[in-house]
């Protein structure tokens, strides 16, 4: 199935067998949710509903049309009359023509396709369909291709053949392409015998070499087509509206098709497709535009090195370009948000709808640009931006703890020779830490760093601890450490994964080597990383995950609410989450897990993070060994920031049923260091009185 999907969609999909990915899946139309039908004799009947006998019932076409119909039914106000006519024209196409358009639309954007290389068995006549789609203005043909675009789609063998004909030097694709493009700009024509001469048309006008070369290039590649950009943009916008995308993702439709290739059973929840996420067409266009902008800018803001002065300057220019736009959107959105709040509208729906405003994406870009300001050492600008971000609480409220922490660091490190000014800034840093710890939106993952900084500042300023802050629990975050030695195998693998020799002389990973040691001293365990905790979380919070919250279930095929990876998940369900955490502290987690497991296991219901390969007995055994308060704290971190807290969980999950003991172990080989996410989890586990240790594995010392 994976191979078929890769070939169909031209993407490289890594093998994700095992744990479900933390992403939503939306297949279209019907999905078989019941057990297989049986014949009279009790034999399993043929339940394959996905056999494609023509393009009319193709899963690609049916899924695409389901998206179109849903968006047009719910949100027609975001399209112009011309756009609606285009969509109607698309619906009027022959089924083979619609099918071919959808298949090429799903492939790489702005790519030319050689008609002779398109092989779709379900389509009766691909060549005829391409011609019709060109005539009906859905495709562009090779007449609009540039020389560079033609060269790009030719194979290396074809380029080498052309190079021999035109006496062009070069062996690699880049060398030959460069020489051909250079040659095309010359006015003299080079014929196959290597002789150069000037060429004139019937009217005595001199030809350029480019015209001659284009003919040769087009002779090699034959007919080519690609979907028109204006149509691709329109249908991608419809995709974004349908999937309620908060990131720019051109593969949403392919995810939908992948889900349709399987017979998934989805959880029961109340479907609430909203029609007012985008108030008007202009807002939708602005949102899609800034999503595409973020796709380009986020990698620049994240990856630009401080040593690359030119790239850093370009990144700064991008920041200063978007800053005034962000400021305008932010001020407008704050005013409108509070107007909506005062209208007694459901706050949960207000927060959900505001996450699809251009201001939400611009705020995310500004948050990412803090990295560039730090590398550029623009301390005053960064400090001002942090103040502005903290002055609002409608966008990225889950990042407030990070902003407090960074702001306190800038204030603590303020450089001056004046001791009074220095004390002022350190006092300001102290106040920032206190505000951060007291802020109800500060997540657990930021508490520990704020607490440690607060202690250092109090000591530096010689301030007495007169009033204890809420939730203030200072902890020693140094885990116990175990040192093991083993024999490392040099397997020539270029990856960073180390390979070790087991007791039975097999090649194993460093985690498996550590697990063998723990099992030898009485522990049961698995190398699970986040898998066990995410499975326990899904089963414990099932009813809360699929609670009827306005706007978060917009498709009948979701494995999680749309807001799970956002700040809104915790805010919109705070009361029910806190009630569930109290039940967990009172020892009821096992009963909740057992009830949900028994109810959903037969259908293998598709839920985010849930791995049905674990038995109910094993999960209950693990829960019975973890202290109830520790389990509640672990789940609190996941409810506050599921996306980021899903990473960094220690490698090994270990338990001893007879002694009712549980422990996590993070395994490190030589020169491997703890990441920030791993440090957070270790701090959280220690503060929650859940045993955790770091297991260092190194090679045997040579005698």
UniProtKB/Swiss-Prot annotation:
Q: What is its main location?
A: nucleus
Q: What happens when the gene is disrupted?
A: Hypersensitivity to a cross-linking agent.
Q: What is the effect of changing residue 360 to P?
A: Hypersensitivity to a cross-linking agent
Reactions it catalyzes: Hydrolytically removes 5'-nucleotides successively from the 3'-hydroxy termini of 3'-hydroxy-terminated oligonucleotides
A Gene Ontology biological process noted in the UniProt record is: interstrand cross-link repair
Q: What is the effect of changing residue 651 to A?
A: Hypersensitivity to a cross-linking agent
Concerning its family, UniProt says: Belongs to the FAN1 family.
Protein name, entry field: Fanconi-associated nuclease 1 homolog
| Organism in which the protein naturally occurs | Schizosaccharomyces pombe (strain 972 / ATCC 24843)
């Amino acid at each position: 199935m994976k191979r078929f999907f890769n070939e169909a969609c031209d993407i490289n999909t890594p093998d994700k067998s095992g744990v479900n990915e933390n992403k939503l899946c939306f297949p279209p139309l019907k999905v078989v949710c019941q057990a297989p039908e049986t014949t009279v004799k009790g034999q399993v009947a043929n339940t394959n509903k996905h056999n494609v006998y023509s393009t009319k019932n193709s899963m690609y076409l049916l899924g695409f049309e389901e998206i179109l119909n849903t968006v047009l039914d719910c949100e027609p106000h975001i399209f112009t009359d011309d756009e609606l006519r285009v969509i109607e024209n698309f619906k009027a196409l022959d089924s083979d023509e619609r099918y071919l358009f959808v298949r090429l639309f799903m492939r790489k954007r702005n790519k030319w396709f050689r008609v002779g290389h398109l092989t779709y068995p379900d389509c009766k006549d691909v060549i005829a369909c391409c011609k019709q789609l060109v005539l009906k203005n859905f495709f562009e043909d090779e007449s609009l291709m540039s020389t560079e675009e033609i060269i790009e789609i030719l194979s290396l063998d074809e380029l080498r053949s052309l190079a021999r004909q035109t006496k062009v030097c070069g062996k690699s694709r880049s060398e030959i392409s460069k020489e051909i493009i250079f040659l095309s700009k010359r006015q003299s024509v080079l014929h196959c015998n290597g002789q150069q001469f000037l060429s004139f048309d019937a009217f005595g006008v001199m030809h350029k070499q480019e015209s001659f070369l284009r003919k040769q290039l087009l002779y090699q590649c034959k007919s080519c087509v690609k979907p028109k950009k204006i149509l691709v943009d329109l249908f991608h916008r419809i995709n974004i509206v349908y999937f309620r995308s908060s990131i720019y993702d051109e593969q949403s439709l392919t995810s939908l098709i992948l889900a349709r290739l399987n017979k998934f059973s989805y959880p029961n929840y109340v479907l609430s497709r909203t029609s007012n996420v985008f108030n008007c067409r202009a807002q939708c266009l602005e949102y899609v535009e800034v999503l595409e902008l973020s796709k380009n800018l986020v990698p620049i803001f994240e990856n630009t090195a401080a040593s690359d002065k030119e790239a850093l300057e370009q990144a700064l220019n991008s920041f200063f370009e978007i800053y005034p736009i962000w400021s305008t959107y932010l001020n407008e959105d704050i005013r409108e948000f509070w107007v909506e709040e005062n209208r007694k509208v459901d706050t949960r729906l207000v927060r959900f709808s505001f996450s699809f405003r251009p201001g939400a994406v611009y705020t995310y870009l500004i948050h990412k640009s803090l990295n560039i300001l730090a590398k550029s050492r623009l301390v005053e600008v960064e400090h001002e931006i942090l103040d502005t971000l903290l002055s609002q609480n409608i966008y990225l409220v889950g990042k407030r703890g990070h902003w407090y922490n960074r702001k306190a660091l800038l204030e603590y490190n303020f450089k001056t020779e004046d001791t009074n000014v220095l004390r002022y800034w350190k006092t300001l840093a102290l106040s920032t830490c206190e505000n951060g710890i007291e802020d109800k939106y500060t997540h657990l993952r930021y508490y520990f760093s704020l607490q440690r900084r607060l202690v250092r500042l109090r000591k530096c300023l010689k301030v007495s601890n007169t009033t204890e802050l809420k939730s203030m629990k200072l902890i020693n975050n140094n885990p116990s450490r175990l040192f093991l030695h083993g024999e490392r195998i040099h397997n020539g693998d270029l990856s960073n994964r180390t390979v070790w020799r087991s007791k039975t002389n097999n090649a194993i990973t460093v985690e498996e080597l550590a697990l063998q040691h723990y099992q030898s001293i009485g522990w049961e365990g698995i190398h699970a990383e986040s898998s066990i905790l995410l499975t326990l979380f899904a089963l414990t919070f099932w009813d809360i995950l699929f609670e009827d919250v306005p706007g978060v279930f917009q498709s009948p095929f979701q494995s999680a609410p749309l807001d799970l990876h956002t700040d809104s998940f915790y805010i919109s369900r705070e009361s029910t989450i806190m009630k569930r955490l109290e039940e967990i502290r009172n020892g009821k987690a096992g009963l909740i897990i057992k009830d949900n497991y028994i109810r959903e296991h037969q259908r293998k219901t598709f839920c985010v993070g849930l791995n049905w390969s674990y038995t109910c007995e094993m999960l209950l055994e693990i829960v019975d060994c973890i202290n109830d308060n520790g389990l509640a704290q672990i789940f609190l971190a996941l409810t506050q920031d599921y996306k980021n807290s899903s990473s960094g969980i220690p490698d090994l999950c270990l338990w001893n049923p007879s002694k009712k003991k549980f422990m996590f172990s993070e395994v490190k080989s030589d020169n491997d260091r703890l990441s920030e996410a791993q440090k957070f989890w270790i701090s959280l586990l220690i503060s929650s009185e859940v045993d955790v240790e770091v297991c260092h594995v190194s090679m045997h010392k040579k005698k």
